[in-house]
């Protein structure tokens, strides 16, 4: 299973949120470039970067910093946050970013998602963020009436190969991932699934790996030292 250390960017710093609440923000490193390099040095093979400023503004804000992070880390990066037009997708991918995550627009503008997948294939990842099973958009500020499973099925139909699923109620809480929802997704869609939200321990990563998922994202637990990079490297190499 591929495990992605997460770096969330706000005002040029690495931060963690609690349940996606921008008022409950903790700065975990003032230097995101050093953080990216440290993760890579300790064995990370792929980084998950979210431009929180971009998610709020609806346009990429931190591309220059992200480019410098990738250059320092020398490993692939996937980036999300405010990517809502083909021009923005082009902007990221032409600048050397490996994959882009389309979140809100996957629900609000399915034609854009379809066009992006047709143009870039596996470089497009769909992000589904849900609260109590219903999809949230616009930096998690708005909650729709669309269920996470219905949206995942729509994503599969338009050709999306990889979906990141975030349970907002668990994000940044260290209460464990939503194994039930991940298992439900695994049963009903045949895309590569990445779990996000709530990972608190090596045991959580092992439980996700046992579901047969493609990947998992580790954030707060890494910064709190509840999970080490050596844990991540070891779990990635276990065959379930």
UniProtKB/Swiss-Prot annotation:
Q: Which family does it belong to?
A: Belongs to the HisA/HisF family.
Kindly give the NCBIfam families that the UniProt entry links to this protein.
1-(5-phosphoribosyl)-5-[(5-phosphoribosylamino)methylideneamino]imidazole-4-carboxamide isomerase
Q: Could you confirm whether the keyword Amino-acid biosynthesis appears in this record? A: yes
UniProt keyword annotations, A-Z = Amino-acid biosynthesis, Cytoplasm, Histidine biosynthesis, Isomerase
Write down what this protein is called.
1-(5-phosphoribosyl)-5-[(5-phosphoribosylamino)methylideneamino] imidazole-4-carboxamide isomerase
EC identifiers of the protein: 5.3.1.16
Q: Which residues form the active site?
A: 8, 129
GO BP terms, alphabetized: L-histidine biosynthetic process; L-tryptophan biosynthetic process
């Amino acid at each position: 299973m591929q495990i992605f250390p997460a770096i969330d960017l706000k005002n040029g710093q690495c931060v963690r949120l609690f349940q996606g609440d921008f008022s409950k923000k903790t700065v975990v490193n003032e230097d995101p470039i050093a953080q990216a390099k440290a993760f890579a040095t300790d064995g990370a093979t792929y980084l998950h970067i979210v431009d929180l400023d971009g998610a709020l503004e609806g346009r990429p804000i931190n591309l220059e910093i992200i480019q410098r992070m990738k250059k320092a880390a020398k490993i692939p990066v996937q980036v999300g946050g405010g990517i809502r037009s083909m021009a923005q997708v082009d902007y990221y991918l032409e600048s050397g970013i490996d994959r882009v995550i389309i979140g809100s627009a996957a629900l609000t503008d399915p034609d854009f998602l379809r066009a992006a997948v047709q143009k870039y294939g596996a470089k497009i990842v769909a992000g589904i963020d849900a609260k109590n099973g219903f999809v949230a958009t616009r930096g998690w500020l708005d909650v729709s009436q669309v269920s996470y499973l219905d949206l995942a099925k729509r994503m599969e139909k338009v050709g999306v190969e990889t979906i990141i699923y975030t349970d907002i109620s668990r994000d940044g809480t260290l209460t464990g991932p939503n194994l039930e929802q991940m298992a439900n997704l695994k049963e009903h869609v045949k895309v590569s699934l990445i779990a996000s939200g709530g990972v608190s321990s090596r045991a959580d990563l092992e439980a996700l790996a046992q579901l047969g998922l493609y990947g998992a994202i580790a954030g707060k637990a890494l910064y709190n030292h509840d999970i080490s990079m050596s844990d991540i490297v070891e779990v990635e190499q276990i065959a379930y």
